[in-house]
Each structure stands twice: as C-alpha cells, then as structure tokens.
Amino acid sequence: MVAMTMASNEADMLPRWIDYYGGQLGVDNLVVLDDNSVDASTDDLPCTLYRLPGPPWKVNWERTRRSLVNGLARGLFACYDVVVFTDVDEFLVPDPARYEGLVHYLEGRREQKVIAPLGLNVLHNPAVEPSLDPSLPLLAQRRFVKFAPAMCKPLLKRIPADWMVAFHGIKAPFAIDPDVLLLHLKYYDVTALRAVSEHRRAMHETDSRGSPHSAWPLGPEALTSRLLSWVETPDGHDIPEFDAAEVDLTEIVRPKAKGFYRTHGPQLPAMDKNPLRRLPERFLKAF
C-alpha cells in the first residue's frame, strides 16, 4: 500500500501527514508531490519527494493535479496492491475497536475495489479547547466534529480507475464504509485556519485554484466566523459522541452522466446544518 499527497507550503500539516501515514505504512511507502513550496517544509523529507514545475501549466491547476496523481497512481500499481491519495490535512483512521491500522483494515476488504471513508470535519472550539500541547495526541485536544458528506471521498483504490472532480469522484462504483473515518483537519485550529485560508485565497486569486463556490475564495475572517458558529454551544461536555448510525449514507454516492461516481453535497452548507458531535473516545489516541 502506498499513500500520496500534494503539499504547498504546509509546514504545519505535512509533518503530521508523514508521521501518521509513515507510522501506518512506513515512510518508504509515502510519496509527496511538492507544489512549489518556499517555506522549507519539503526539505530533507524521509520519504519519496517529487518537486513539480511551477505555473503556467497546459491546463488549470485542478486538472493538472488530477492528471499528475492519476498518472502516478497507474504507475504505482506495478508495485502496490492499494493506492491512496489524500490532501495533506486528511487522515484515514479505521475504527480502533476493530482494526490495528490501515493495513489490517484493508486485509479484510480485498474484494472491494474502491473504498470511501466516512468524512468528519474536526473543529476547534477555542472557548473550551486551548492551544495544542505537542506532547499530547492532537485528537485528544480537538474533540468536536461534524459529518461532512462531501468528505466521503473515494480515496482508497485497488484498481487504476481515474479520480475525478477534486478526488470527490472516480470512474468506478464505490460505497462509503463507516468502519474507516476521514478526519479532515482544515478547521482543527483557529490560528492555523487563518493562515491556511489566507494562503489559499491568494492562490485562488493568482492561479484560479479551487472552485469559486468552495471555501478557497473565502478569507480568514469569513471562515473563522463560520467555524465559531459551527461550534457554538453553552457547554461542550453536553455534546453527544458521533455515531455513524445517525447519518444516512445511501444517497451520498451518485452516478454521473460522464461515466463516473461522486459524492454529493456542498461542504459549507452541510457544516451549517449538521449537528455538532464529539469524536468517540476510542479514536482519541489515533494521532
């Protein structure tokens, strides 16, 4: 099994990604695509690194990224049975009550050609959660989550079917498996969110990255305000734990006219609507 990501100036998140997936798969089975970082975050990495040429590209950034990753994935199937691609802030965590890790989880799913995790956004509530203590697991310090249908992305595959639409779709049928979570850390820390959202807004304006209808064009003020509205609660300890049984997964994956399947549902409206939950206790030591 090999895991890939693409990173641009991710000094905060890239070390977390390498530490987690390196612990799951071994750093020799990680591939980082460096999208023109200038913050030294990709210097002296312990895993395979490819430095990408800068813009202008032949096509837009999203199509360039997708073509690169799909091409690499097809080649990697010469050496691996499973290829995974995640954004640098996305962490695939099988249920610790049932699995020792990703490898153990996949051993029991050899017949599933494409797997999508159940997506949760990890949210920071600064009213009750202080700054991170690096000596403690991150998830033990960031307990709040919301179900995000759009984050149920088909990221694990055993076949060279091409990913589509920013990796929310793929040219093969797939199902969402609640036994593995995708924990999305974009909103895990207010200070980090401000920095990341400013960086992404600048890239959206200069290189047209990200959809105009996504969070990319929104700056730190708008996204911080939305995050605080999502976690607003008189007492965080009264929030129940997330239970996959409370969400309907049957209508999220839909076939599209061009012969691929994708998850349905914009992320920001889902965050406004879906109830706030706590990450179950058994996940708190995952990373």
Regions found by a protein language model. Name each.
Residues M1-V2:
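Cell-envelope/extracellular polymer assembly enzymes that use nucleotide-activated donors
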Residues T5-R16, N36:
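Active-site beta-to-alpha loop of glycosyltransferases that engages the nucleotide-sugar donor
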Residues D19-D28:
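Short, acidic, metal-binding catalytic loop of nucleotide-sugar glycosyltransferases
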Residues V27, Y80, R110-V114:
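Short, high-confidence coil segments that cap the C-terminus of an alpha-helix
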Residues N29-D34:
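Short, hydrophobic beta-strand segments that form beta-sheet elements in well-ordered domains
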Residues V38-F85, P94:
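Active-site-proximal specificity loops/subdomain of glycosyltransferases
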Residues E62-S67, P96-F287:
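Catalytic-site signature of metal-activated, phosphate-bearing donor transferases
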Residues F77-A78, F85-V88, Y99-V103:
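Active-site neighborhood of glycoside hydrolase catalytic domains
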